Amino acid sequence: MPNVQKTVVKKSHKFVIDCTAPAGKIVDVAAFEKYLHDRIKVDNKVSNLGSNVVISKDKSKIIINTTIPFSKRYLKYLTKKFLKFKQIRDFLRVVATTKNTYELRYFNIGDSESQE
């Protein structure tokens, strides 16, 4: 019987965090990219990205490409921590718009005032 080698295909995941709504006003996208680069853990180690996780910036969007299993929920957690760190968590929220995309949006304060 011939020896058959199985090849393992690595799935790549692409996640997007869209900061277009508050882009130029209060969120510094470059600082957010650096924050993610410094805080994302790979194999339980911070700043161990290597070629497994690639973080890039496109105007007001952060794009994270991974070849390892990676949780979208972990990106939401880090985004909320960044907003809290910059003390803008009271104004912005993180909303999932598609399967692989998060978006920063302002809270709808005007709707709650009109209902009263």
Curated annotation (Swiss-Prot):
It comes from the Eukaryota. InterPro entries: Ribosomal_eL22 (IPR002671), Ribosomal_eL22_sf (IPR038526). The gene is rpl22a. The lineage of its organism: Eukaryota, Amoebozoa, Evosea, Eumycetozoa, Dictyostelia. GO terms for cellular component: ribonucleoprotein complex; ribosome. Belongs to the eukaryotic ribosomal protein eL22 family. Pfam families: Ribosomal_L22e. One of its GO terms (biological process) is cytoplasmic translation. Keywords: Ribonucleoprotein, Ribosomal protein. PANTHER family: 60S RIBOSOMAL PROTEIN L22, LARGE RIBOSOMAL SUBUNIT PROTEIN EL22A-RELATED. GO terms for molecular function: RNA binding; structural constituent of ribosome. This is Large ribosomal subunit protein eL22B.
